[in-house]
């Protein structure tokens, strides 16, 4: 299969942040990486390949060079996507149906969740003999739907509508009480009374597909940011460096500000890098010579809403690596890091394009500037161009994933003197 087909498969397995980490973990295991645990003593060896997971939803992998290293070459993306999360007491008996009480996670296009097959995935937690155990859940079948209100009862719906999650976005699940809890418990082989906690989300069941007259586009759920997560992981697994530690990182909770123990604003990255170095002096010297790519997708020019993009800094699907710029440093790219990215792209034979928001339409921030609060190093914000960001079904360019993989491979082997 090609990169796009493999990406679609990766997305299909990564129904939430926990399954995204599990999918990455499986790829790392296949490639001979060893899992380390934060509560254990580490014995990191030259030439070794390792990964660390925090909260089951963030992951950092690294490969040591066979000799003393000079710096860290880091690529970071995120594992989470906007969705609806189940509330602790989620079943509502309403007029012959059981519907589920949900809360919005991240900023989503709510209408894109209507009238399509949905299901539930995430994790549940049990405890036995004082030991907490986490199990992943994926109800791998069409289970739920959030039905629209018929136009006969909402005549002005096409003139614009403000959705209310509590009223409009509760999925219907059954005509019997308690069945969803039973199905979740059966999925992981426990009694529902054993479930002491859960983090469960809805996900769109529609599989990704290639489209366009020549297959130049593809659509899928969670392209933001699994396209970058997949591309950076594949680039990492197919790269090597003689002089630097190569690092792959994927953080949770980017969509809600990253301010969690497993988010980009946490100590996770710093903790891992410090333990690789063993002492403060080595760590500080290495970080001073290091470089990070913060990888998160960007808004392509929308052909139906072209005026929403900047007049000159416009990016297009299949146009290659997007270098993201913001005067207020919501993106970390500056003249130095921009030059590094362009240099790497040219060496990789990969096209690049410059992105800035329209000056009167502010965009969102991403990982780089937040991660820099804990690990201050030269960073550029990059991504790939896509449409319908934060829809439950997004669209991107079929050629761009390969561009990103090639660029990341080149980045990891590049010696950057700053």
Regions found by a protein language model. Give the residues of each.
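N-terminal hydrophobic/helix-forming segments and targeting peptides
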Residues: 1-418
């Amino acid at each position: 299969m090609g990169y796009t087909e493999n990406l679609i498969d990766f997305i299909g397995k990564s129904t939430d942040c926990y399954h995204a980490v599990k999918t990455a973990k499986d790829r790392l295991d296949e490639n001979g990486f060893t899992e380390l645990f934060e509560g254990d003593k580490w014995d990191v060896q030259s030439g070794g390949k390792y990964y660390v997971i925090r909260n089951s939803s963030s992951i950092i992998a690294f490969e040591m060079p066979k000799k003393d290293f000079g710096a860290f070459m880091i690529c970071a993306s995120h594992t989470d996507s906007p969705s609806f999360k189940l509330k602790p007491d989620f079943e509502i008996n309403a007029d012959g149906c059981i519907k589920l009480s949900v809360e919005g996670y991240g900023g989503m296009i709510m209408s894109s969740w209507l009238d399509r097959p949905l299901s539930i995935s995430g994790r549940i937690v049990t405890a036995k003999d004082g030991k907490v155990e986490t199990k992943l859940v994926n109800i791998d079948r069409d289970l739920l739907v959030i039905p629209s209100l018929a136009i006969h009862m909402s005549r002005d719906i096409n003139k614009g509508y403000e959705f209310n999650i509590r009223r409009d976005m509760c999925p219907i699940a059954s005509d019997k009480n308690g069945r969803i809890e039973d199905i979740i418990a059966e999925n992981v082989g426990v009694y529902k009374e054993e479930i002491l906690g859960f983090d469960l989300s809805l996900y769109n069941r529609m599989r990704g597909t290639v489209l366009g007259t020549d297959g130049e586009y593809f659509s899928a759920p969670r392209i933001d940011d699994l396209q970058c997560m997949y591309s950076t992981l594949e680039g990492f697994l197919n790269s090597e460096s003689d002089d630097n530690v190569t690092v792959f990182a994927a953080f949770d909770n980017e969509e809600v500000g990253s301010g969690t123990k497993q988010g980009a604003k946490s100590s996770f990255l710093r903790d891992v890098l410090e333990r690789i170095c063993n002492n403060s002096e080595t760590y500080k010297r290495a970080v001073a010579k290091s470089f990070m790519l913060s990888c998160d997708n960007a808004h392509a020019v929308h052909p139906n809403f072209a005026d929403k993009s900047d007049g000159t800094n416009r990016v297009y699907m299949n146009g290659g690596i997007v270098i993201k710029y913001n005067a207020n440093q919501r993106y970390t790219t500056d003249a130095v890091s921009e030059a590094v990215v362009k240099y790497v792209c040219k060496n990789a034979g990969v096209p690049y394009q410059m992105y800035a928001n329209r000056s009167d339409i502010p965009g969102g921030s991403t990982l780089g500037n937040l991660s820099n609060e804990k690990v201050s190093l030269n960073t550029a914000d990059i991504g790939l161009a896509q449409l319908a960001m934060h829809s439950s079904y997004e669209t991107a360019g079929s050629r761009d994933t390969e561009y990103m993989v090639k660029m990341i491979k080149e980045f990891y082997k590049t010696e950057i003197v700053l």
